[in-house]
Regions:
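Conserved "cap/hinge" positions at secondary-structure junctions
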Residues: 50-52, 86
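Conserved aromatic beta-strand anchor motif in extracellular beta-sandwich/beta-rich domains
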Residues: 67-69
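Residues that flank catalytic or metal-binding motifs in active/ligand-binding sites
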Residues: 46, 61, 109
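Extracellular/periplasmic metallocenter environments
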Residues: 2-18, 76-120
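Beta-strand acidic-aromatic groove motif in beta-rich domains, primarily in extracellular
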Residues: 59-65
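Beta-strand-rich interaction surfaces with strong enrichment in secreted/lumenal proteins
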Residues: 37-40, 71-76, 84-85
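N-terminal edge beta-strand
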Residues: 13-47
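Acidic, Ser/Thr
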Residues: 53-57
Length: 120
Protein backbone atom coordinates (compact mmCIF):
# COMPACT_ATOMS: atom_id res chain seq x y z
CA UNK A 1 0.00 0.00 0.00
CA UNK A 2 1.12 3.54 -0.68
CA UNK A 3 2.06 5.46 2.46
CA UNK A 4 -0.25 8.31 3.32
CA UNK A 5 0.96 11.51 4.93
CA UNK A 6 -1.57 11.30 7.73
CA UNK A 7 0.10 8.07 8.87
CA UNK A 8 2.99 10.09 10.31
CA UNK A 9 2.08 12.33 13.26
CA UNK A 10 4.49 15.09 12.18
CA UNK A 11 3.65 15.09 8.44
CA UNK A 12 3.03 18.57 7.11
CA UNK A 13 1.86 20.39 4.02
CA UNK A 14 2.78 23.79 5.50
CA UNK A 15 6.18 25.20 6.32
CA UNK A 16 6.77 26.71 9.73
CA UNK A 17 9.42 27.65 12.26
CA UNK A 18 8.56 27.44 15.96
CA UNK A 19 10.81 28.58 18.78
CA UNK A 20 10.41 27.53 22.41
CA UNK A 21 13.36 28.89 24.38
CA UNK A 22 16.47 27.47 22.71
CA UNK A 23 14.51 24.72 20.91
CA UNK A 24 13.65 25.40 17.28
CA UNK A 25 11.32 23.14 15.29
CA UNK A 26 11.29 23.55 11.52
CA UNK A 27 8.50 21.86 9.56
CA UNK A 28 9.66 21.71 5.96
CA UNK A 29 8.06 20.46 2.76
CA UNK A 30 10.02 19.01 -0.13
CA UNK A 31 8.50 19.02 -3.61
CA UNK A 32 10.68 18.80 -6.72
CA UNK A 33 12.66 20.91 -7.29
CA UNK A 34 12.41 23.03 -4.14
CA UNK A 35 12.26 22.95 -0.38
CA UNK A 36 9.42 24.95 1.13
CA UNK A 37 11.76 27.63 2.54
CA UNK A 38 14.82 29.47 1.28
CA UNK A 39 16.51 29.82 4.66
CA UNK A 40 16.22 29.21 8.38
CA UNK A 41 18.03 31.34 10.96
CA UNK A 42 18.87 30.00 14.43
CA UNK A 43 21.22 30.95 17.24
CA UNK A 44 24.44 29.20 18.16
CA UNK A 45 23.62 26.58 20.78
CA UNK A 46 19.98 26.13 19.72
CA UNK A 47 18.60 22.60 19.59
CA UNK A 48 17.22 22.40 16.06
CA UNK A 49 14.74 19.81 14.79
CA UNK A 50 13.96 19.61 11.09
CA UNK A 51 10.80 17.65 10.24
CA UNK A 52 10.88 17.06 6.48
CA UNK A 53 7.83 15.86 4.52
CA UNK A 54 8.08 14.81 0.88
CA UNK A 55 4.85 15.95 -0.82
CA UNK A 56 5.65 14.44 -4.23
CA UNK A 57 3.27 11.76 -5.50
CA UNK A 58 5.62 10.00 -7.93
CA UNK A 59 6.38 6.56 -6.41
CA UNK A 60 10.18 6.67 -6.78
CA UNK A 61 10.78 10.39 -6.23
CA UNK A 62 12.76 10.65 -3.02
CA UNK A 63 14.39 13.83 -1.78
CA UNK A 64 17.67 14.06 0.04
CA UNK A 65 18.22 16.29 3.05
CA UNK A 66 21.89 17.00 3.64
CA UNK A 67 23.64 19.42 5.97
CA UNK A 68 27.20 18.30 5.37
CA UNK A 69 28.75 20.59 8.01
CA UNK A 70 26.68 18.69 10.61
CA UNK A 71 27.15 15.22 9.07
CA UNK A 72 23.41 14.92 8.35
CA UNK A 73 22.24 13.12 5.21
CA UNK A 74 19.06 11.12 4.62
CA UNK A 75 16.43 10.48 1.94
CA UNK A 76 12.69 11.03 2.40
CA UNK A 77 10.49 8.93 0.10
CA UNK A 78 7.20 10.11 -1.42
CA UNK A 79 4.62 10.96 1.26
CA UNK A 80 7.14 10.11 3.96
CA UNK A 81 8.26 12.28 6.84
CA UNK A 82 11.62 12.06 8.58
CA UNK A 83 13.22 14.21 11.23
CA UNK A 84 16.61 15.03 12.65
CA UNK A 85 17.62 16.93 15.80
CA UNK A 86 21.03 18.50 16.36
CA UNK A 87 22.71 21.34 18.24
CA UNK A 88 23.59 24.34 16.07
CA UNK A 89 27.13 24.68 17.36
CA UNK A 90 28.87 26.04 14.26
CA UNK A 91 28.15 29.73 13.49
CA UNK A 92 27.94 30.66 9.83
CA UNK A 93 25.98 29.81 6.71
CA UNK A 94 25.43 26.10 6.10
CA UNK A 95 23.91 24.83 2.88
CA UNK A 96 21.13 22.28 3.00
CA UNK A 97 20.69 20.45 -0.27
CA UNK A 98 19.01 17.49 -1.92
CA UNK A 99 21.36 14.55 -2.46
CA UNK A 100 18.93 12.40 -4.44
CA UNK A 101 18.54 13.28 -8.13
CA UNK A 102 14.89 14.35 -8.23
CA UNK A 103 14.30 16.68 -11.17
CA UNK A 104 15.98 18.38 -14.12
CA UNK A 105 16.46 21.36 -11.77
CA UNK A 106 17.75 19.13 -8.96
CA UNK A 107 20.75 21.39 -8.32
CA UNK A 108 18.34 24.21 -7.42
CA UNK A 109 16.94 22.20 -4.49
CA UNK A 110 18.85 23.88 -1.72
CA UNK A 111 18.41 26.29 1.17
CA UNK A 112 20.50 27.97 3.84
CA UNK A 113 20.79 27.32 7.55
CA UNK A 114 22.13 30.49 9.17
CA UNK A 115 23.59 29.99 12.63
CA UNK A 116 24.09 33.33 14.37
CA UNK A 117 27.09 33.46 16.71
CA UNK A 118 26.48 34.13 20.40
CA UNK A 119 26.85 37.77 21.31
CA UNK A 120 26.42 39.00 17.74
Amino acid sequence: HRPRMEEHPDATTKNSIERNGNKVTVRLTASAPVYGMQEVAVNEGDEVTFIVTNNDEIPDLGHGFCVSNYNINFVVGPFQTKSVTFTAGKPGVHWIYCTNFCHALHLEMRMRLIVKARGV
